[in-house]
From Swiss-Prot:
The lineage of its organism: Bacteria, Pseudomonadati, Pseudomonadota, Gammaproteobacteria, Pseudomonadales. This is CRISPR-associated endonuclease Cas1. Disulfide bonds: none annotated. Belongs to the CRISPR-associated endonuclease Cas1 family. It comes from Pseudomonas aeruginosa (strain UCBPP-PA14). The keyword DNA-binding applies.
Length: 324
């Protein structure tokens, strides 16, 4: 059999890549031609390989550094790099402004333009952008219903949600979003549903009283896991938008002027359906962050979350003349 040179190997499609990394207190560098992260324990350094060809995004938290050579290799492999705070918290906080994640996207000049052209075809029209936002919310609701009621893995793990109460919450939200006259009402309804879902999840896992804390200020396990898991969703969302060549600033719901708003729009497609229940399950089990993170990654992979994000973006983008 003839040898195959590295240049002849096929690139793994982003939607089929298996890895998403969140790292803290380590150095990312190139060692022996491979991208690795290094952790120090006393006088010893441990080197861990990052399979960049099978990785979608890399989130760097507190105490991390990365070399220019590593950034070059990650960009070449199409891996998005995001800088965030520790434990899945905002990178910077200043008065009213939080920078959730500062993204460095691979600067390939060969990104597709088809979806960008279709996206801007409706984006400048307020009403069409509202219709697109409704489409995102419909997809979110269907994902919540499917995951919470039909995911056997969640059910076997002990997530015993009240099916009737969930159905009522989803139906109420569906009616409200169809009647929402503007983006502000849609955002209000999104927050209202999330509050109901938090209550249902707390009841399903017997967590007790729960209040969602903002900006990483929560001290209880469920709040910490929610913050951490949401950043994994941001990583996939940033990858999905970059793959299709749609800039992160072209949001349909989270504000035209909010930095990276489209990433939050896309992440919301799966946060409540996949991250939220796992946060409560892991909190009740007493999981460590690494255990929770792995459970989330398993959920995201099993549910083909990145495929779902990309397909939803395509569906909206292809409606150049979006109609209600």
């Amino acid at each position: 059999m003839d040898d195959i040179s590295p240049s002849e190997l096929k690139t793994i499609l982003h939607s089929k890549r298996a890895n998403l990394y969140y790292l803290q207190h380590c150095r990312v560098l190139v060692n022996g031609g491979r991208v690795e992260y290094v952790t120090d324990e006393g006088r010893h350094s441990h080197y861990w390989n990052i399979p960049i060809a099978n990785t979608t995004s890399l989130l760097l938290g507190t105490g991390t550094s990365i070399t220019q050579a590593a950034m070059r290799e990650l960009a070449r492999a199409g891996v998005l790099v995001g800088f965030c705070g520790g434990g899945g918290t905002p990178l910077f906080s200043a008065n009213e402004v939080d920078v959730e994640v500062s993204w460095l996207t691979p600067q390939s000049e060969y990104r597709p333009t088809e979806y960008l052209q279709r996206w801007v075809g409706f984006w400048f029209d307020e009403e069409k952008r509202l219709v697109a936002a409704r489409h995102f919310q419909r997809a979110r609701l269907e994902r919540i219903r499917h995951s919470w009621l039909e995911d056997r893995v969640l059910r076997d793990a002990g997530f015993a949600v009240d099916a009737t109460a969930l159905a009522v919450a989803v139906e109420d939200s569906a009616r409200a979003l169809e009647q929402a006259p503007n983006h502000e009402h849609l955002l209000t309804e999104e927050a209202r549903l999330s509050k109901r879902l938090f209550k249902l999840a707390a009841q399903a896992t017997r967590y007790g009283e729960f209040v969602r804390a903002k900006r990483g200020s929560g001290g209880d396990p469920a709040n910490r896991f929610l913050d951490h898991g949401n950043y994994l969703a941001y990583g996939l969302a940033a990858t999905a938008t970059w793959v299709l060549g749609i800039p992160h600033g072209l949001a349909v719901l989270h504000g035209k002027t909010r930095r990276g708003g489209l990433v939050f729009d896309v992440a919301d497609l799966i946060k409540d359906s996949l991250i939220l229940p796992q946060a409560f399950l892991s909190a009740m089990r007493g999981d460590e962050e690494q255990d929770f993170r792995q459970a989330c990654l398993d959920n995201l992979s099993r549910a083909q979350a990145l495929d779902f994000m990309i397909d939803t973006l395509k569906d909206v983008a292809q409606r150049s003349t979006v109609s209600a």
